[in-house]
Regions:
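Conserved helicase ATPase motor motifs in RecA-like P-loop NTPase domains
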Residues: 1, 27
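Walker A/P-loop
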Residues: 4
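P-loop NTPase motor domains
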Residues: 11-21, 28-210
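Phosphate-interacting basic helix/loop segments used at nucleotide- and nucleic-acid interfaces
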Residues: 7
């Protein structure tokens, strides 16, 4: 139905006008936008004939500035963030925690902050949860009740989250949104293409990235 070509055309026009673009490549067919066409390509004669028919006199093959991204680091630059930057509120929503479990997660973050513990990846968070569970009685006086059952639930949710590939998303260096807002030397906006074909099979991880 031409949806891919329509999307590519819109993205090209934004790029040509100096506007960076983000594209999620769900079907794996957007990457061709980065490569210039050629008169030797299939159907090139039909394209050129159509260009003349509609009066497109400056028709020419041209590539586009593109950067490929992949949360798994397989088909593009890896995208990373830290547990600290994600924060307890968003993590709690992604793991479908109830109010009590979210409260324990908040305590874990506060405990890490008060003790200068870095929360970079899932292993860091698991370690802090273990520390909180082991010292639940002592920490409860300062932070509030820490239910070991809630800690166990959070740990199980983290394992399920990790099984979707989340471990590859959390780490350093952390992604900066400005990485998506760049132009090339000629003033054309970069087309940031996210490899989402595999990512779509892990909805929670996809939602985490967005």
């Amino acid at each position: 139905t031409g949806k891919t070509v329509t999307l590519q055309t819109i993205a090209e026009q934004f790029s040509a006008n100096g506007v960076p673009v983000f594209l999620a490549d769900v079907k794996g067919d957007l990457s061709g936008i980065a490569m210039a066409g050629s008169p030797e390509f299939k159907n090139a004669d039909k394209l050129e004939a159509r260009a003349k028919e509609i009066g497109l006199t400056d028709y020419a093959y041209r590539d586009n500035p593109a950067v490929f991204w992949d949360l798994y680091g397989e088909q593009g630059h890896p995208i990373r963030t830290t547990i600290s930057e994600m924060g307890p509120l968003l993590l709690a929503r992604l793991m479908d925690l109830n109010d009590t479990q979210e409260g324990v997660l908040n305590i874990a973050f506060r405990y890490a902050d008060d003790n200068g513990l870095l929360l970079i990846d899932l292993e860091d968070l698991q370690s802090v949860l273990v520390a909180c569970a082991e010292a639940a009685k002592e920490l409860g006086v300062r932070y509030g009740n820490i239910s070991k059952a809630s800690v166990g639930t959070i740990q199980r949710q983290l394992l399920a989250f990790e099984s979707q590939g989340a471990a590859k998303f959390f780490g350093e260096p952390a992604f900066e949104i400005n990485d998506f807002l760049r132009c090339d030397e000629g003033g054309r906006g970069y087309l940031n293409i996210l490899a989402a074909e595999k990512l779509m099979q892990s909805p929670k991880l996809y939602a985490t990235f967005l």
